[in-house]
Amino acid sequence: MSFDLSFPKSFLWGGATAANQFEGAYNEDGKGLSIQDIAPKGVMGPITEVPTEDNMKLIGIDFYHRYKEDIKLFAEMGFKTFRLSIAWSRIFPNGDDEIPNEKGLEFYDKVFDELQRYGIEPLVTLSHYETPLNLSKKYNGWANRDLIGFYERYVRTVFTRYKDKVKYWLTFNEINSAIHAPYMSAGIWTDKSELSKQDLYQAMHHELVASALAVKIGHEINPDFKIGCMILGIPVYPLTPHPDDLIEKMRVERESLFFADVHARGKYPRYMNRLFKENNIEIKWHEDDAEILSNVVDFISFSYYMSSCATADEEKKKAGAGNLLAGVPNPYLKASEWGWQIDPKGLRLILNELYDRYEKPLFIVENGLGAVDELVTDENGNKTVNDDYRIKYLNDHLVQVAEAIEDGVELMGYTTWGCIDLVSASTAELKKRYGFIYVDRHDDGSGTLERYKKKSFNWYKEVIATNGKSLER
């Protein structure tokens, strides 16, 4: 028995971005350097001493100077929400400054005003892999407890400044990714190969306390704020029915969901005691940490690109391609050009798993297909991209989202990743495109930065206009 594809009337359709991947203007109007400005090869690549010309993020797609043009295109698609991040080092250039950079604050005022003009709700990530470089070099990032105070000053500043312009906030992007990418996720300067589990989990404790503190401060400044956490969402399948594979699935799942457990329940889960004991980890708590952690989030948000397989067989374990947590390849799934396995039903699964676990509203804030796009001229002489592959990917995933809603999941909204082409976080390429809008910029630095609507632009516009009824089963 089938049902009509149905989404709530208040469903927040939109798109998602990150400051470091699309703003550009990395050193304009008082902005300081972030950890991204010396990472030209992506999340897992080597860093450089200073910003280099091959770092595509320094210019990005120049949203900083073209935000009006881009927001107009988002409005044409009918966006109800637009996810963006505030570049921390645009507000506090060194991270530990006492006084914020007014020009940085003014820029986001203008962006939020422009969104408001079109009736688009901003969804703002406070920290999206953008730790100020000074905090990384001088303090070793979140490994140092001092960052809680610097983050508190930053969030208090932006919450106060934008309290009447922004309702929806996310504290950290994919906070659980710090396990695998401590530099990008937590700004930890110590090389990953030399970083102890003690220091890694202590850093994550600092982030969790800071996140809960942001929830507390935000609700004090404006009780109407809706503040969520954001995790890298990846459902885990056992590779085989062997009990050892199921135990490994449980371990991998807990490693990932530990962060959401703390955000949603306000305390550490008991299962972490064993991990800490077996790895000689002793978290240093301050006397008020437990009370601060009790400030739970209003909703759980997550990214979804792929599922994963877990196995206890060491010979089968290998670093699969993917967004940090790929695990073992699933023999039943096809993969994208970048090796990311495509699993629409996995999205339905994780929606149900997260809602069953937390019974809090959920928000899909990243989902999409990175692919090589070819710009062509259509019969009317307009430049476009015939990205039927992207349409199919998104359609198939959204059908499964509708299934999850029918299952009983409370879902606030859906924002596709990279709604306009931007620089990839994982590989730092522009060749890997996600958007409904093609940006004429290439990995050799060439291009006009002109914007062109892809075929998927009008497809998504119709999906939003019909509140999902135009989707095909």
Swiss-Prot record:
Keyword Hydrolase in record: yes
GO cellular component terms listed in the entry, alphabetical order: cytosol
A GO BP annotation: carbohydrate catabolic process
Class of this enzyme: hydrolase
MF (Gene Ontology): 6-phospho-beta-glucosidase activity
Reactions catalysed: 6-phospho-beta-D-glucosyl-(1->4)-D-glucose + H2O = D-glucose 6-phosphate + D-glucose
EC number: 3.2.1.86
Entries under Pfam families matching the protein: Glyco_hydro_1
Record InterPro entries: Glyco_hydro_1 (IPR001360), Glyco_hydro_1_AS (IPR018120), Glyco_hydro_1_N_CS (IPR033132), Glycoside_hydrolase_SF (IPR017853)
Active site per database record: 174 (proton donor), 366 (nucleophile)
Keyword Hydrolase: yes
Keywords, sorted A to Z: Glycosidase, Hydrolase
The family this protein is said to belong to: Belongs to the glycosyl hydrolase 1 family.
Protein name: 6-phospho-beta-glucosidase
Gene name as annotated: abgA
